[in-house]
Swiss-Prot record:
Required cofactor names: Mg(2+)
EC number(s) on file: 6.1.1.6
InterPro entries (alphabetical): Aa-tRNA-synt_II, aa-tRNA-synth_II, aa-tRNA-synth_II/BPL/LPL, Lys-tRNA-ligase_II, Lys-tRNA-ligase_II_N, Lys-tRNA-synth_II_C, NA-bd_OB-fold, NA-bd_OB_tRNA
This protein's encoding gene: lysS
Annotated localization: Cytoplasm
Subunit structure: Homodimer.
HAMAP family: Lys_tRNA_synth_class2
Cellular component GO terms held in the UniProt record: cytosol
Protein source organism: Methanospirillum hungatei JF-1 (strain ATCC 27890 / DSM 864 / NBRC 100397 / JF-1)
UniProt superkingdom: Archaea
Binding site for Mg(2+) 1: 403, 410
Residues engaged in binding Mg(2+) 2: 410
Protein name: Lysine--tRNA ligase
Catalytic activity: tRNA(Lys) + L-lysine + ATP = L-lysyl-tRNA(Lys) + AMP + diphosphate
GO molecular function terms attached to this record: ATP binding; lysine-tRNA ligase activity; magnesium ion binding; tRNA binding
Amino acid sequence: MQDNPSIQFDDQRLAKRQQLIEAGVPMYPHEFRRSHTIAEIRAKYSQAGHDPSSDQVITAGRLYGVRDHGKTFFADLRDETGRIQLYIRKDALPEGKFQMFKSSIERGDIIGVTGRIFKTKVGEISIFVDDIILLTKTLCSLPEKFHGLTNLEKRYRQRYLDLIVNEESRETFRTRSRIISLLRNYLTGQGFLEFETPTLQPLYGGANARPFTTFHNFLGQKLYLRIAPELYLKRLVVGGFEKVFEVAKNFRNEDIDTSHNPEFSMVEIYQAYADYTDMMKLTEGIISSIVHEVTGSYEVAFEENTISYKAPWTVMSMEEAVRTIGKVDIFAHDLESLKKIGKEKGVDGIDDVHTQREMLVLFFEALVEDKLIQPTFITDFPVENSPLAKSHREKEGFVERFELFIAGMELANGFSELNDPLDQMERFEAQEEKRRLGDEEAQMHDYDFVNALGYGMPPTGGVGIGIDRLVMLITGNTSIKEVILFPSMKREVTTPADEEEPSSV
């Protein structure tokens, strides 16, 4: 039964399960009707006296912390809403139930109880148990009570166990759920409509990234997991929807580290008749509102810093940031001088670029990004790095694009969206040339999208906000694995599929 090391059934628990079956005790009843959750009991009976009330409550949860006192037991029962103490006495239970509890029910099992509420002498709200029903006999032992589950890899691989034993993890994911709800509410309150666009796409685009590839047998064609929903959402703007968004799962075949996971969540937002300055204001409003709603403050601690989300946030161009923070005036030096300075400062990739504008991006990434602790919009990116953004109205060779940085992490990316179909075609052709030269992250030429622009897209602003990183910042978690329920990890056990050659398609 336990040939696979992923299955960790406990032999003693299996034996107790068999004893219960032989005694005719149902292991897994089909349902159990509660009269109250634990939080409801605590709220309703907070003024209970020391003698059990005449009111009967029926509740259920997972059993923790069993304390044996011979003919009585104390135990902790927990459900999603909270914890309550059980007082179990032999002479108060139906015949045989106390012995069943003592011999076969243990920490981690899920039980239902019927009883009356009272307060102990120290003021602890408790249930005087009149009956116990076993709802689920667990076969795996929980980690030791006082040390919990501290192995990081096990916490990520067995998130279900992490959630059982670590309240901090449960609270993180409660907060994540609330953040996403608040995000949706904010946007719909501003008149945006939520849409769903394809996850399997015949072309990948919307960002520079290496895609995951698959094959559709019936269609007989290669498909890609989306790296961004951008081009489909902008088609909706062409079609007449003026304020659109999608909370999307995106997939990028990239490295895994503390701020990157191959499968991640973003919200992408597009608004007709707006530009990148409008999208910066929208982004600022969304994030500051969510932070205040969740934490009750605009000041949130992250690592050793206190981040202030109170508007207005800092806005500076990339050129200004490199000059003032990185201490390099890019356009005051020629390429050879910049290469020399870059090597002295440890800037990577400088031998692979051929313009000052491309140098600007490399210097920014190496010298500035991790110093942007407070919320900062970096604006005006080189055209070479932004194939979907509109050319800057004042700066030749640049586009109207911004990225938001907080605590040294990129949190959002937005544009005045390119809506000139001929300009877009030229940008795609430049990306295709990069692909021919071996750049796996360059975008594909989406002819249908160019055709859509030919029908006319109004001036449009767009932004994508990383949900996982936003949750990290609000909850104080420094690893993206802490805020994704089931992060990507290398499989522990090799399977035949791992030994197959990668498909040529």
